[in-house]
Amino acid sequence: MRIIFAGTPDFAVPSLRAAAQRHEVVAVYTQPDRPAGRGRGLTPSPVKLEAVARGIPVFQPQTLRSPEALATVRKLDADLMVVVAYGLILPKAVLAAPTHGCWNVHASLLPRWRGAAPIQRAIEAGDTETGVCLMQMEAGLDTGPVLLSQRIEIGEQETGGQLHDRLAALGAQVLSDGLGLLRAGIRPVAQPQPDDGVTYAHKLDKAQARLDWAQPAQELARRVRAFNPWPVAEAILAGERVRLHGAVALELAHQHPPGTLLAASKQGIDIACGEGALRVRVLQREGGKAITAADYLNARRDLPALR
């Protein structure tokens, strides 16, 4: 089959590899190169790097809404377009251009967590399971019928980064299964999404990563896990702003104001929350690298009462 692949971040790379394994990927669409790093030089997306390494033609339009962009898609004469975390809206004309339309690999069990950040929002909400859906795309935001799906459990201490990697691999497998069926002349049965159970995974930003100690410790611990490795939770601890890379909630009754340091040891730094306490295990000072609580205490000799 002739396939157009559209994707941008690391999450999409395993799916591109799966598509290219037994099919002809005639073109890759990805976001334009963006400034990144200390030098702010233009940096290609992970998907572009993979496509270039495979010798696949790369297209990086600012939009797919122009007549020129549509003409290019049609000229590729594709059987199918596969979209994985691309980042641009596909107009109806593009969705209809390939023979079999457009498939999307989405990192949630739809209709739960439609939108941009389903992995992080699932952890933040305390979901115990999630998965991947292969969806036939339509004009709405992640509203199309589901062709195939797989579910997995979310680990009790699993971070957003760890779950991201597992779902990226699972998404590639689900896509491979779907492409195998289509190649054999079997079109997966499209199951409409139910009207109930719809939630939206709004895009992450750094402002959401600022923790408020007045919130319950369980909620804060989930946010620390969800926002690792990006945007990384941050809070005021012992008078300075730090980033939190690892923490667990403690069911601890106390009468202390939120933000009070309750105890500190090699096991972690315990901070009073609106309910319970948060034990910070790995943190990062401004301008520094991530360190253990023990190393942080060694650097903060001004906290003798907590040792």
UniProtKB/Swiss-Prot annotation:
A single cellular component GO annotation: cytosol
EC number: 2.1.2.9
Keywords, sorted A to Z: Protein biosynthesis, Transferase
Keyword flag Ribonucleoprotein: no
EC class: transferase
Record-level Gene Ontology MF annotations: methionyl-tRNA formyltransferase activity
Residue positions binding (6S)-5,6,7,8-tetrahydrofolate: S108, L109, L110, P111
Catalytic reaction(s) noted: L-methionyl-tRNA(fMet) + (6R)-10-formyltetrahydrofolate = N-formyl-L-methionyl-tRNA(fMet) + (6S)-5,6,7,8-tetrahydrofolate + H(+)
Highest taxon listed in the record's lineage: Bacteria
InterPro entries in UniProt: Fmt, Formyl_trans_C, Formyl_trans_C_sf, Formyl_transf_N, Formyl_transf_N_sf, Formyl_transferase-like_C_sf, GART_AS, Met-tRNA-FMT_C
Gene3D superfamilies associated with the record: Formyl transferase, C-terminal domain, Formyl transferase, N-terminal domain
A Pfam family reported for this protein in Swiss-Prot or TrEMBL: Formyl_trans_N
NCBIfam families per the UniProt record, alphabetical: fmt (TIGR00460)
Protein family: Belongs to the Fmt family.
Job description of the protein: Attaches a formyl group to the free amino group of methionyl-tRNA(fMet). The formyl group appears to play a dual role in the initiator identity of N-formylmethionyl-tRNA by promoting its recognition by IF2 and preventing the misappropriation of this tRNA by the elongation apparatus.
HAMAP family attached to this UniProt entry: Formyl_trans
Protein name: Methionyl-tRNA formyltransferase
Species for this entry: Xanthomonas euvesicatoria pv. vesicatoria (strain 85-10) (Xanthomonas campestris pv. vesicatoria)
